């Protein structure tokens, strides 16, 4: 850069700092790059698919899927993992369907969980914004976007047309809270439902509720589906679940993870550790027997997983080894370089 341009830039930067304060414009090279902090989802495979070991803090995340696919279970699992790290969590229950007993079975400390059951969509989003701006809450779940009913619709007659009201509400709210979320380093997860577009002949007829704003503002979007049943004999005890990362601004997208959700217990984490351990050669499988470091740990996956539950120190060592190996291949994006990519994408 020639001297005239340097002087002009220095004058512009000086004027900006006087008007907007120090740090309004920064040179990226002046600060050390830091990896984006993440909160585990409770699923080892999904943490690895996300590329940074979990869901990114200071960002908006959308989780959507059909009914009974595991959306709320996954978010409660995120809360349980965050609380283990001492985080403060809040659940904005717009659907009025949160079951404290079920949340407790998944490992959530229900006594410390902040819960709100708002009357209108405006109230729900205002509460979310105030919690974010407090800088004291680390994780906020909004369940769900479809239940964020505008005040005008609640006060109107049944059958009245309210075209675009919810989409406008979401667009305005997200414009307002996105910057606050980044400053507070808070993870905000919106659960969303699926609807069908009428008259779509080709392509995917599925869409999510609440307009397009959330699709743009979300740094991560997860599509969760139930792919089958987990049975013990004839009894169904859980569901096979597949999660696809359909958007990811912090790591390469379109990866997917498969795991089991057991009813009343949550994500079958030890089963995932066994599967990934076999895949990486850390756990040896010979016929139906599983061995770890030369010692047999069980006949059949269920018994091997039970061994890890009974010996948590071995399970945690194995999990850490799997994380270190697979996340090193993923190559997490550094925070400041990623911000530039965001700006270019938007």
UniProtKB/Swiss-Prot annotation:
<keyword id="KW-0963">Cytoplasm</keyword>
<dbReference type="Pfam" id="PF21096">
    <property type="entry name" value="RecA_C"/>
</dbReference>
<dbReference type="GO" id="GO:0006281">
    <property type="term" value="P:DNA repair"/>
</dbReference>
<dbReference type="InterPro" id="IPR049428">
    <property type="entry name" value="RecA-like_N"/>
</dbReference>
<dbReference type="GO" id="GO:0016887">
    <property type="term" value="F:ATP hydrolysis activity"/>
</dbReference>
<dbReference type="InterPro" id="IPR023400">
    <property type="entry name" value="RecA_C_sf"/>
</dbReference>
<dbReference type="InterPro" id="IPR020584">
    <property type="entry name" value="DNA_recomb/repair_RecA_CS"/>
</dbReference>
<dbReference type="GO" id="GO:0003684">
    <property type="term" value="F:damaged DNA binding"/>
</dbReference>
<dbReference type="Pfam" id="PF00154">
    <property type="entry name" value="RecA"/>
</dbReference>
<keyword id="KW-0234">DNA repair</keyword>
<dbReference type="GO" id="GO:0009432">
    <property type="term" value="P:SOS response"/>
</dbReference>
<dbReference type="GO" id="GO:0005737">
    <property type="term" value="C:cytoplasm"/>
</dbReference>
<keyword id="KW-0742">SOS response</keyword>
<comment type="function">
    <text>Can catalyze the hydrolysis of ATP in the presence of single-stranded DNA, the ATP-dependent uptake of single-stranded DNA by duplex DNA, and the ATP-dependent hybridization of homologous single-stranded DNAs. It interacts with LexA causing its activation and leading to its autocatalytic cleavage.</text>
</comment>
<dbReference type="GO" id="GO:0140664">
    <property type="term" value="F:ATP-dependent DNA damage sensor activity"/>
</dbReference>
<dbReference type="InterPro" id="IPR013765">
    <property type="entry name" value="DNA_recomb/repair_RecA"/>
</dbReference>
<dbReference type="InterPro" id="IPR020587">
    <property type="entry name" value="RecA_monomer-monomer_interface"/>
</dbReference>
<keyword id="KW-0238">DNA-binding</keyword>
<dbReference type="GO" id="GO:0006310">
    <property type="term" value="P:DNA recombination"/>
</dbReference>
<dbReference type="GO" id="GO:0005524">
    <property type="term" value="F:ATP binding"/>
</dbReference>
<dbReference type="InterPro" id="IPR027417">
    <property type="entry name" value="P-loop_NTPase"/>
</dbReference>
<dbReference type="GO" id="GO:0003697">
    <property type="term" value="F:single-stranded DNA binding"/>
</dbReference>
<protein>
    <recommendedName>
        <fullName>Protein RecA</fullName>
    </recommendedName>
</protein>
<keyword id="KW-0547">Nucleotide-binding</keyword>
<keyword id="KW-0233">DNA recombination</keyword>
<feature type="binding site">
    <location>
        <begin position="65"/>
        <end position="72"/>
    </location>
    <ligand>
        <name>ATP</name>
    </ligand>
</feature>
<comment type="similarity">
    <text>Belongs to the RecA family.</text>
</comment>
<dbReference type="InterPro" id="IPR003593">
    <property type="entry name" value="AAA+_ATPase"/>
</dbReference>
<dbReference type="InterPro" id="IPR020588">
    <property type="entry name" value="RecA_ATP-bd"/>
</dbReference>
<keyword id="KW-0067">ATP-binding</keyword>
<keyword id="KW-0227">DNA damage</keyword>
<dbReference type="InterPro" id="IPR049261">
    <property type="entry name" value="RecA-like_C"/>
</dbReference>
């Amino acid at each position: 850069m020639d001297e005239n341009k340097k002087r002009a830039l220095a004058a512009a930067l000086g004027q900006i700092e006087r008007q907007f304060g120090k740090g309004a414009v920064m040179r990226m090279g002046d600060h050390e790059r830091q990896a984006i902090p993440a909160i585990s989802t409770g699923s080892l495979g999904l943490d690895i698919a996300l590329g940074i070991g979990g869901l990114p803090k200071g960002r908006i995340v959308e989780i959507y899927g059909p009914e009974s696919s595991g959306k709320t279970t996954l978010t409660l699992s995120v809360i349980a993992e965050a609380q283990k790290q001492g985080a403060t969590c809040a659940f904005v229950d717009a659907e009025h369907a949160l079951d404290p007993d079920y949340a407790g079975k998944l490992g959530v400390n229900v006594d410390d969980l902040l819960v709100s059951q708002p009357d209108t969509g405006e109230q729900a989003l205002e509460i979310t914004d105030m919690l974010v701006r407090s800088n004291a809450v680390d994780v906020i779940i909004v369940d769900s976007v479809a239940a964020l009913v505008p005040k005008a619709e609640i006060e109107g007659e049944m059958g009245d047309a309210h075209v675009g009201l919810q989409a406008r509400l979401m667009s305005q709210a997200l414009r307002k809270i996105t910057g606050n979320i980044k400053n507070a380093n808070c993870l905000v997860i919106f659960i969303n439902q699926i609807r069908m577009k009428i008259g779509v002949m080709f392509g995917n007829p599925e869409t999510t509720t609440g307009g397009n704003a959330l699709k743009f503002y979300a740094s991560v979007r997860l599509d969760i589906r139930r792919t089958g049943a987990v049975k013990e004999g004839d009894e169904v005890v859980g569901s096979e679940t597949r999660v696809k990362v359909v958007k990811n601004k912090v790591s390469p997208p379109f990866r997917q993870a498969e795991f089991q959700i057991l009813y009343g217990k949550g994500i079958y984490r030890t089963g995932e550790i066994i599967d990934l351990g076999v895949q990486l050669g850390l756990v040896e499988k010979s016929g139906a027997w599983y061995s770890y470091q030369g010692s047999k740990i069980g006949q059949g996956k269920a018994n091997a997983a039970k061994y890890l539950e009974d010996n948590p120190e071995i399970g945690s060592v194995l999990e850490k080894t799997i994380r270190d190996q697979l996340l090193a291949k993923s190559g997490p994006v550094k925070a400041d370089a990623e911000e530039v990519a965001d700006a270019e994408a938007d």
